[in-house]
């Protein structure tokens, strides 16, 4: 497990960890772990990435929710989402309709594990 998975969060507090690019993990005192915009591709050309490997293995975090902010490739990444789903099949994916449509068509994640959100 990644060290963030073992971080003890006091009641009323929130743990935050940055995983590079725009990916963050949020953890509360009840153990909910939300991954925001996970982008961990395995094909990492040196001209585009600082590190040759992803900053975390998706199976190393007990992910309960994934929050996608919008449908750009580095915010809604089917490759990463497929690995999260294989490791944590009960994790819920939350995002705007465009992201959720992509999730439903390009991954094995079903509609019962997704929630559409909208501005307003």
Tell where the protein language model's regions lie, with residue ranges:
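Metallo-beta-lactamase
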Residues: 1-11, 93-120
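Pre-active-site segment of Zn-dependent metallo-hydrolases
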Residues: 4, 25, 29-68, 79-83
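Short hydrophobic/aromatic beta-strand or adjacent loop that forms the aromatic wall/cage
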Residues: 21-23
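A short helix->loop->beta-strand "cap" motif at the edges of active sites that frequently abuts
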Residues: 32, 87-92
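Active-site metal-binding loops of divalent metal-dependent hydrolases
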Residues: 38-41, 71, 98, 120
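Active-site environment of divalent metal-dependent phosphoester hydrolases
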Residues: 42-43, 72-76, 100-103
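Glycine/small-residue-rich loop that forms an oxyanion/phosphate-binding "nest" at active or ligand-binding sites
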Residues: 68-71, 78, 94-96
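Metal-dependent catalytic neighborhoods of phosphoester/phosphodiester hydrolases
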Residues: 77-87, 102-106
């Amino acid at each position: 497990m990644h060290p963030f998975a073992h971080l003890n969060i006091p009641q009323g507090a929130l743990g935050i960890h940055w995983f590079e690019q725009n990916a963050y993990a949020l953890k509360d005192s009840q153990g909910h772990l939300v991954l925001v915009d996970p982008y961990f591709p395995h094909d990492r050309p040196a001209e585009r990435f600082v590190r040759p490997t992803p900053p975390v293995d998706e199976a190393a975090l007990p992910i309960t929710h994934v929050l996608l902010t919008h449908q750009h490739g580095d915010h809604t990444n089917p490759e990463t989402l497929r690995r999260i789903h294989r490791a944590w099949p009960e994790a819920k994916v939350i995002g705007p309709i465009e992201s959720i449509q992509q999730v439903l068509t390009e991954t094995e994640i079903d509609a019962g594990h997704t929630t559409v959100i909208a501005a307003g």
